[in-house]
A protein has these predicted regions:
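A small-residue-rich subset of transmembrane alpha-helices
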Residues: 77-108, 181-211
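Histidine-/acidic- and/or cysteine-rich, low-complexity loops and terminal segments associated
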Residues: 1-50, 72-76, 110, 114-119, ...
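Transmembrane alpha-helix/helix-exit interface in multi-pass inner-membrane proteins
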Residues: 96-111, 123-152
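Juxtamembrane transmembrane-helix termini in multi-pass membrane transport proteins
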Residues: 45-92
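Residue-level signature of transmembrane alpha-helical entry/exit and packing/kink sites
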Residues: 10-14, 40-44, 83, 87, ...
Length: 211
């Protein structure tokens, strides 16, 4: 298969996965009361992973394409081939672990809100404060470092390359951490907006993609 056809196929598969995930999220939001904390951890994490595929795969596609390109070139040179799913699996693992922290944090916040009426009375102010924090974080050195790593796929591959299955898994973890460093506070914004708010998710996806 030619390089161009291979790249087109990989990109098409990534976008199909993202599109299918969006369809699932829209269906989920229309058939339930949303992604409330009343659901179990397993269901929450399953929906969370679908969210990450829908929102992050379009942005992460350039990195995955570069990884596949380098793997193809190395295979031609006689090196062992490692499938891209190893890299993607590690990348999604980082977001899944973050989702678990989000779930635990939401349970704690819900319990605290029931015990402290002030929180519910000032929910709008707290939500506004989260927006301010998200805006300020965009200006921090940590944000700039993480964004630089995510915006230069070839540079990341050249400086972070590791051989074999463990190496690809490590690279996926590393790239996932940088992506998380870029976007974690933006995802926290979904709480005041509604975790299953499709319009908010689409807007955040567009912001992340443009960034």
């Amino acid at each position: 298969m030619s390089l161009r056809r291979e790249r087109t196929l990989i990109l098409a598969l990534l976008l199909i996965l993202a599109a299918a995930s969006w369809v699932m999220l829209i269906w989920q939001s229309s058939t339930t009361n949303g992604m409330g904390m009343g659901m179990g951890a397993a269901l929450f994490l399953a929906i969370w992973v679908v969210m990450m595929i829908a929102m992050m795969f379009p942005t992460a596609a350039p990195m995955m394409l570069v990884f596949a390109r380098v793997q193809r070139d190395r295979r031609s040179g006689g090196y062992a081939f490692v499938p891209m799913w190893v890299f993607i699996g590690a990348y999604l693992l980082i977001w899944t672990l973050f989702g678990a922290l989000v779930y635990l944090g939401a349970l704690f916040a819900e319990e605290l809100a029931q015990q402290v009426p002030w929180i519910m009375m000032n929910a709008a102010r707290i939500g506004g404060g989260i927006f301010v924090l998200a805006g300020l974080y965009q200006l921090t050195p940590l944000k700039r470092v993480c964004l630089a790593k995510c915006c230069m796929p070839l540079d990341f591959i050249l400086t972070s390359w590791r051989d074999g299955y463990p190496g690809a898994f490590h690279m996926g973890l590393e790239h996932g951490i940088y992506c998380l460093g870029c976007c974690w506070l933006l995802f926290v914004l979904l709480f005041p907006l509604g975790i299953m708010n499709i319009a908010a998710m689409a807007l955040l996806t567009a912001l992340i993609f443009v960034e």
